Amino acid sequence: MQDVIFFLSKHILLISIWIFCFIAAVFFITRTLLSKSKMINNFQAIKLINQDKAIVVDTRSLESFKEGHILNSINVPLKNIFLGKIKEIEIYKMFPIILVLSDTYKVNACIKKFFEYGFNRVYILKNGLYYWKTDNLPLIVNDK
């Protein structure tokens, strides 16, 4: 027991770092498990689209949307979501929603808004369209 106390007294910085890392890990794991929404990868998204008729909501700007988007996705810019202008997707409340986000720092606020509007099954496409393109999955390009 004296050896443990001696070790702790000589290595306070090391022990502090370990305690901080442990608390951070517990926090992030708990937050992930208790989160109402779920981060999904491309193949989970494809499965949701094909089997559960999930609706893809692309929150990027109209210009970015026209440069390339997932087939049958609906463009609702992030600012419209925060302003409550979501008439295009209100009829899809009973379907799973897959969000394509470009601003990852607004993820939690965006998800909160969707739950406020009555959407119960909200998923986030991990890394937006970046990995979708990396995996060479199809994109629709509008030049209009």
Swiss-Prot record:
Domain Rhodanese: from-to ranges: 50-140
SMART domains: RHOD
Pfam families for this protein: Rhodanese
SUPFAM superfamilies per record: Rhodanese/Cell cycle control phosphatase
Designated name of the protein: Uncharacterized protein BU052
Species of the source: Buchnera aphidicola subsp. Acyrthosiphon pisum (strain APS)
